[in-house]
Amino acid sequence: MRSDEIKKGIERAPHRSLLRACGLKEEDFGKPFIGIANSYIDIIPGHVHLQEFAKIVKEAIREAGGVPFEFNVIGVDDGIAMGHSGMFYSLPSRELIADSVETVVQAHKLDGLVLIPNCDKIVPGMIMAAARVNIPTILVSGGPMAAGHTSDGKPIDLATVFEAVGGIKKGLIDEKQLIDIETHACPTCGSCSGMFTANSMNCLAEALGIALPGNGSILAIDPRRKELAKQAGRQIVELVKAGLKFRDIVNQETIENAFTLDIAMGGSSNTVLHLLAISHEAGIEFPMEKIDEISRKTPTLCKLAPASQYHMEDLDKAGGIYAILKELSKKNLLHLDRPTVLMKTIGEAIKDAEIKDTNVIRPLENPYNETGGLAVLFGNLAPDGAVVKAAAVDPKILVHRGTAVVFDSEEEAIEGITNGKVKEGNVVVIRYEGPKGGPGMREMLAPTSTIMGMGLGDKVSLITDGRFSGATRGACIGHVSPEAAAGGPIGIVQNGDEILIDIPNRKIELLISEQEFERRMKEFKPKKKEIPSPWLRRYSKFVTSANKGAILSDECS
C-alpha cells in the first residue's frame, strides 16, 4: 500500500505517533488509508448537506475495512458570485481545488480517494486532482436540487429568476411575480435543478466511469442518495484492493464517451473547458476539432432546463444517464469496453438500462436533432474555436447575420443592454472577459438572461471570449479563442461590423475584407487591465487559452 510509506517500519514511529493522536489504533496500520475530499460549505446550497453526507461515506469505509480521513475543499457558488467581481474567482477556484486535493493526497500518501463535490468548479477541480495523483478514486456528489414551482404550479429554477430580472426591467412582469419566482425557484439543497454546469459534470462522471449509476440524476433529498454514499464508501476499499487506478479507467476513449454523452444530453458549454482540463491532467491530447467530429455524428436525445421545462428529477424518472448511454450504444457511438468503478465495463454496466419516458429521453429514431447539443465553431473571428450550446438555441436564430454592438466588459454590456443600445438583429460582442483578460473568464449569465427576459432571445446573438453559465440559453457563443487579451481577432471588431454566425455549418466570421482584417490585426494592441488581487495576477499570467481548457501553464518563463 502507498500508505505504508508513512506507517511501516521503525523510521515511521513519529508518523504513527501523530496518527495515534488522530484516533488510530494498532490494527488500523494494516488497513488502506482512504482520503475523503469533502466540499461542505454553508454558503452553497449544493453543499450545505455534505457534512452529514460524508459521515455516511466514512462509516461505510470503516465497515469495509478501510481508514477514512476527511479533509476540506473550498468552493464558490457561481450563482451568488454572478454579475459582480466575485465571478473573477470562479474558474480560478478550479485550479486551487485541484492543487489542494493533490497536496493532501500526496503529502499523506493516501491509498484511495473519495471525491464529494457537487457544484460547478468543485467537480472538475477534484477530478483534475484525481487524474494527477492517479490512485483508486470514486466520485459521489451531493445530488441535484428539486425543481421549484410558482404559485400557479409552473416548474422553475434559478435561471428563471435571472430571466425574471430582465422581464421586470422590460415591464413584462411585476414585482409581485418576481418575488413569487424568487421565493420558489430553489426549494431544497442540491445543485441547481437543470442541466447546468454542476449537474452536467456529475452526469459526465458516470460516463467517465468514476461514479456510480445515478450519481448525476438522483436528487439530493432522495433516500437513494444516501445509499449511493454507502455504496461509494464500500466500493473505494474494493478498488484499492484491486489496484484499479484513475488512469486505468480514464483514457482517450473514456473522454470520447464523456463528450458523446455531453453532446447527446445537451450539457453545459462549460463542460468543454473542464473535460479538456481533465484530459490534460490525465496526459491526453484532445483537440477541439475532435469534439466537433463527435458532435456531427451524435444525436441530441435529451433537452432539460434551460432548453425545456424538464429538470433533473424528470431525467432520473426517465431512466437516468445510463438510459441515454444505452441508447447511444445502439448506434455504436461508445467505447463499451472501458472499465468503471463498478469493476465491470461500461457496456456491462448499462446492459439493463432502459428509457422509461420518451418525452424526456428520446430514442434514436426520434431525436431532437440528428447532430449534437454542443457545437464548436471556427472562422476568422475564432481561429482556435468557439463553443455554443446548440440545444438551447432557438431554431430561428441558428443562422444569424447581424451588426456588432461591442462592449469591453460584462458591466458595460449589462448597462448597454438595459439602456436600449441593443436592438433586434444585433450581435452583441463582449470581450476582454477571457481567462487572461477577465481574468477568470467570467460567466455572462446576467447579460444573456437580460436579453432573454426582454424578449430578444430569438432576435439577438451574443459572442464572447468569456463563458456562459449552464443556465444560459439562446444564441450565445463563448470561449472565443484566442481571446482579446491574447491578441485574438475578437479584439478588432468595431461597432457596426457585420458578423455571420452559422451554427449548422460551424462558422463564425467577421465580414470585412481580408485587407481590412489584416490591417486591423497589425495595428491591434490589446488593452491592459489593472488587476488588484495578487492571486488573480498570477492566474492571469499563467492561464492558457479556453481551447486548452484554461489550465495553468507549468512553464515558469
Curated annotation (Swiss-Prot):
Q: What is this protein called?
A: Dihydroxy-acid dehydratase
Q: What are the recorded GO MF terms, alphabetically?
A: 2 iron, 2 sulfur cluster binding; dihydroxy-acid dehydratase activity; magnesium ion binding
**Which species is the source of this protein?**
Sulfurihydrogenibium sp. (strain YO3AOP1)
Membrane-spanning segments: none
InterPro entries reported in the protein's UniProt record: Dihydro-acid_dehy_C (IPR042096), DihydroxyA_deHydtase (IPR004404), DiOHA_6PGluconate_deHydtase_CS (IPR020558), ILV_EDD_C (IPR056740), ILV_EDD_N (IPR000581), IlvD/EDD_N (IPR037237)
- Which catalysed reactions does the entry list for this protein? (2R)-2,3-dihydroxy-3-methylbutanoate = 3-methyl-2-oxobutanoate + H2O; (2R,3R)-2,3-dihydroxy-3-methylpentanoate = (S)-3-methyl-2-oxopentanoate + H2O
Co-factor requirement: [2Fe-2S] cluster; Mg(2+)
Concerning SUPFAM superfamilies, the annotation shows: IlvD/EDD N-terminal domain-like, LeuD/IlvD-like
Q: Which UniProt keywords apply?
A: 2Fe-2S, Amino-acid biosynthesis, Branched-chain amino acid biosynthesis, Iron, Iron-sulfur, Lyase, Magnesium, Metal-binding
Which residues carry out catalysis? 469 (proton acceptor)
GO terms (BP aspect):
isoleucine biosynthetic process; L-valine biosynthetic process
Task: Summarize where [2Fe-2S] cluster binds, as residue positions.
Answer: 119, 192
Do you know which Gene3D superfamilies this protein is assigned to? Answer: IlvD/EDD C-terminal domain-like
